[in-house]
Amino acid sequence: MGHLPRGTLGGRRLLPLLGLFVLLKIVTTFHVAVQDDNNIVVSLEASDIVSPASVYVVRVAGESKNYFFEFEEFNSTLPPPVVFKATYHGLYYIITLVVVNGNVVTKPSRSITVLTKPLPVTSVSIYDYKPSPETGVLFEIHYPEKYNVFSRVNISYWEGRDFRTMLYKDFFKGKTVFNHWLPGLCYSNITFQLVSEATFNKSTLVEYSGVSHEPKQHRTAPYPPRNISVRFVNLNKNNWEEPSGSFPEDSFIKPPQDSIGRDRRFHFPEETPETPPSNVSSGSPPSNVSSAWPDPNSTDYESTSQPFWWDSASAAPENEEDFVSALPADYDTETTLDRTEKPTADPFSAFPVQMTLSWLPPKPPTAFDGFNILIEREENFTDYLTVDEEAHEFVAELKEPGKYKLSVTTFSSSGACETRKSQSAKSLSFYISPTGEWIEELTEKPQHVSVHVLSSTTALMSWTSSQENYNSTIVSVVSLTCQKQKESQRLEKQYCTQVNSSKPVIENLVPGAQYQVVMYLRKGPLIGPPSDPVTFAIVPTGIKDLMLYPLGPTAVVLSWTRPILGVFRKYVVEMFYFNPTTMTSEWTTYYEIAATVSLTASVRIASLLPAWYYNFRVTMVTWGDPELSCCDSSTISFITAPVAPEITSVEYFNSLLYISWTYGDATTDLSHSRMLHWMVVAEGRKKIKKSVTRNVMTAILSLPPGDIYNLSVTACTERGSNTSLPRLVKLEPAPPKSLFAVNKTQTSVTLLWVEEGVADFFEVFCQQLGSGHNGKLQEPVAVSSHVVTISSLLPATAYNCSVTSFSHDTPSVPTFIAVSTMVTEVNPNVVVISVLAILSTLLIGLLLVTLVILRKKHLQMARECGAGTFVNFASLEREGKLPYSWRRSVFALLTLLPSCLWTDYLLAFYINPWSKNGLKKRKLTNPVQLDDFDSYIKDMAKDSDYKFSLQFEELKLIGLDIPHFAADLPLNRCKNRYTNILPYDFSRVRLVSMNEEEGADYINANYIPGYNSPQEYIATQGPLPETRNDFWKMVLQQKSHIIVMLTQCNEKRRVKCDHYWPFTEEPIAYGDITVEMVSEEEEEDWASRHFRINYADEAQDVMHFNYTAWPDHGVPPANAAESILQFVFTVRQQAAKSKGPMIIHCSAGVGRTGTFIALDRLLQHIRDHEFVDILGLVSEMRSYRMSMVQTEEQYIFIHQCVQLMWLRKKQQFCISDVIYENVSKS
């Protein structure tokens, strides 16, 4: 006997078994048996032997693999059997015998199928089937699961005297339910066997496991009795005799001798009353009493619950003493009982009361052996009686008043099982008054109970009921939130324990608390069942006095107070902001704070983004389920302060200070922050401020040299700022400029110079020329003015004089001048006249020779003078005006300088070389027919635009004598961007202001006449940070709906205009005016924005057109003429739809502004006329605001645009159809 796996039999002639079933010869038989220990025994019979030389092999199949066994070699006797230890119990195996004779394998003689026996059930549990314990049971069996196979379970038991058995397969996890047993019957000797089944060759094998568990027994519950009813009869006490019976003499119930008095029967309200038997007399029962005796064949049955009035805990589940079982002291029997008799002198004269209890047998086919009767009175006395199965009535006498409870149950006791009672039928509860009257049980609970919250402290209950035999209600209220709070932190006291009231209004509630209310109906001392509990909550009132205290750029402290009356679980602190990571704005919870008894609370919120807009909200969340919170209106908004910038570099050259700084780190987001701009401040003897847009972190300041400046950069938001650490910069003093020697005499000379920057004093030193070391040295003279007279000089002597500026004890580089004193004998007047004559002759000759050669250079110098080269020599006067002789000498010198300089010098000294009374207001004109315009342009452009230059020089003389006193007021000087671009008084725009101070109505702006109106335009400078509020005030007061901006805020590292509008769509207040950017559209060369400005209850829409491709002091490129004309036409189309003057500005409000106005007027003029007068147009504009069309280049550009307008008009006959159509930008 041995176990031979496949693939190991080649040496023993078993290799052919694996695949060589070639030759079929002999058919044999063999024997297979299965033992109890799960061994399969295979033995050979004598008839199986073919030849002793043959090999006999057994194949076992059934498990996951096949097993092969070879019989031992034998001669005369049969070999011992082959034994296979089966792994599985309850599994079928196929046994095959194979004979190998040489290399020939016979066909298997036959295959025998055997089935092993499954392992038995080890334990059994039997339970009631809770939905139906009368007919149903739950079986739970336990058995070995590993290697145990079965298909069904055989259940055997004795049903009374009958034996039952059945095969059952609906077991799930070892459990199944029987729901067809008989009620009240004893089932015994219950056993379970596992059954294995197999089908092979149309034959079925079945094996049963043994029974190893203890046999079980179980009795089903009997059904309860039906149609229980009770009758009451008041007995005449004088006629009553002591009957014989089993009741004690002092019992509170006694069996009656006869029935005298009124007969009353009480039924379950849900059951149908039965017809009384003929031998029972009935009185006149009330409406809920039936005279019918129950039908013995009735099968009506209803399972009911225990009464609610008897156990006071049902009315007061948390406090059993809340409801008193005894009759209340103020109980009035005349008003509370349905039927009442006047009490006699003896309150117990109506006793004893005879009670007759009747019932019907339980629903068939219930097996039962009798009935149990339970009589209770006020939990003090209990009688438990048993009657046999034939009894259907029980009579007793009640000797005392009180609350009674009756119940009748069925019991079953026959058989070997334990005695079992039925579930209790609905108990009968009633009250017997001292007068013998009875009150039936209240069985209905209040329906549709609801609570309506009237206020934060009161609520009103409502309900419905079909019963009308109750006279009051009980409202039981308990707080569900009180017990959730720690006693030390408890915020409510009133309803922490159950409180009962007879009023429907619930008072003294606390906001934020959650309550549960139960209602009972009450009649006399009887209390009905409780209603379904109703839960309601009072919304919290929310916090108040929410305050915010900033702690720097990234942290704030929120503090608030809670209402005195209120209960809640926690505070929830939320914040709303734009998240630059997710690019979304949403409310997020930052922190939760547990509720405390403290009236105040605070929280520190950190890790905020600097210069960011936040909304904070604090809500109170209740304990209830679901949670309630209040209130979303408890919010506060705040813009965090920016972080302090850090100045990284400061460089000074060419009289300009270059400052650079950094802000935050690489992750700092400026594009979505509330950063408005930077304020760069240089504070020395003069404080200089400059506003820089937030996207630029460099600034250029023109600082007077010679001073020590405290530099700082301030990051500004709408509500706060943060300043960098200061940086001290000391600028070396500059040498005096324009040093002149005037009013020379034989022994003295007067030196005159211009101060450059800041100087504490000047040191003047004169040394005689050619004296060598023996010359007399003059002592240095320290002066604080710009004029000094050096005396004690030698006549007719040459001196080298120097003037050095001193500032903060630091000297500048000296400025030198060579002077000579007058000769004693010579008349000074003759010398002066001679010198002037020689100088005049030389000057005239020089001008004639170099006029053509230096023309371009002269014009370039004029342009380089710019707006910032004006020097007011009037400041040189310290004590009155300069002497006339000085002024003449200065004039003679200044005529050598370019006209842009000396005209300002002359005006500064009030010197007019052309006229004693000055130039009057002039009107120039030069009309040109458009048909001749091309040839006119060619003629004007000859010799490097020489004739254009002559015309433009004449334009410079316009308006020199027009006053601008308002602009020169000290209060208004800071409102001017450039000191030499000032508005004329007669045409300036005056602001309406409640402030009557001088200069309150001033803004650097002038009315300019147009093609349609004498005040069609307002030309103004680009707003300064100090004047942006006045700018918006002008827009609102002038009812302007169009603003044209012809500059960028920063050009060539210089600030040209303040960013006077909001960066984002968030409204910003400029003084009393709020500006909101509704929309913004970007084109290739310009941007258009829609603003809405609000003041009080007034709103005004404004369109803002910003042309960004126009260089300062210049003109757009030649190929951009189409673009600028398209822009002008776009603005004109919008202007046609609105009223009020158009506001036009660039930086100074004269160059690009004048060019735009000229093009807009000419565009309208050419549409209706065949000539133009550009010279007259510019002359007229300059008579309303100085320097309109500021450069000659701009003046020529206007002519080029007119040439293009006329060309398009000639080509298309309608200029607007072609040149101004909206073309897409590539």
UniProtKB/Swiss-Prot annotation:
Residues 1-29 form the signal peptide. GO terms for molecular function: cadherin binding; protein homodimerization activity; protein tyrosine phosphatase activity; Wnt-protein binding. The chain crosses the membrane at residues 833-853. One of its GO terms (biological process) is negative regulation of canonical Wnt signaling pathway. Residues 30-832 are extracellular. It catalyses: O-phospho-L-tyrosyl-[protein] + H2O = L-tyrosyl-[protein] + phosphate. It is a single-pass type I membrane protein. The modification Phosphoserine is found at residue 875. Residues 948-1205 form the Tyrosine-protein phosphatase domain. The keyword Oxidoreductase does not apply. Residues 296-305 have a biased composition (Polar residues). Disruption phenotype: Modification of podocyte structure such that the normal octopoid podocyte is simplified to a more amoeboid structure and that the foot processes are shorter and broader than normal. These changes are associated with altered distribution of the podocyte intermediate cytoskeletal protein vimentin/VIM. Mutant animals have a reduced glomerular filtration rate and reduced glomerular nephrin (NPHS1) content. However, there is no evidence of proteinuria. After removal of one or more kidneys, Ptpro-null animals have higher blood pressure than does their wild-type littermates. Keywords: Glycoprotein, Hydrolase, Membrane, Phosphoprotein, Protein phosphatase, Receptor, Repeat, Signal, Transmembrane, Transmembrane helix. The active site is at residue 1146. The modification Phosphotyrosine is found at residue 1220. SMART domains: FN3, PTPc, PTPc_motif. Belongs to the protein-tyrosine phosphatase family. Receptor class 3 subfamily. Possesses tyrosine phosphatase activity. Plays a role in regulating the glomerular pressure/filtration rate relationship through an effect on podocyte structure and function. Interacts (phosphorylated form) with FYN and GRB2. This is Receptor-type tyrosine-protein phosphatase O. It comes from Mus musculus (Mouse). The gene is Ptpro.
